[in-house]
């Protein structure tokens, strides 16, 4: 079973993604957060296998959050960035998302 965390400030986006992911038998949503500070704590507490991360959060950009925790994440965590803004694509790719 893969542990999943969703970090997004839009509750509707979290619920849509949760609904889509819950039909996958090998994925378990372990937590959600609406900002980077709560998301960072969830990541460090839960050690997810898969992180869905919105690029635009109220307190920090998702790319910046990933950059800040990179040294602390010592497990294999896959990151899926998503956003409505294509201007962040290259920066996200540079962060290995």
Where do the model's predicted regions map?
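Conserved sequence signature across two-component system core domains
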Residues: 7-8, 33, 51
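Two-component/phosphorelay signaling modules centered on CheY-like receiver
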Residues: 2, 11-31
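CheY-like receiver
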Residues: 40-97
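Short hydrophobic beta-strand elements that form part
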Residues: 5-6, 81
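Extended hydrophobic secondary-structure segments
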Residues: 7, 13-14, 58
């Amino acid at each position: 079973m893969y542990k999943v965390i969703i970090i997004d400030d839009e509750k509707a986006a979290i619920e849509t993604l949760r609904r889509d992911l819950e039909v996958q038998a090998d994925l378990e949503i372990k937590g959600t957060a609406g900002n980077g500070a709560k998301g960072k704590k969830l990541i460090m507490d839960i050690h997810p296998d898969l992180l869905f991360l919105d690029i635009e959060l109220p307190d920090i950009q998702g790319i910046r959050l990933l950059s800040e925790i990179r040294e602390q994440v010592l497990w294999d965590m896959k990151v899926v960035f998503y956003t409505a803004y294509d201007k962040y694509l290259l920066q996200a790719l540079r962060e290995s998302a």
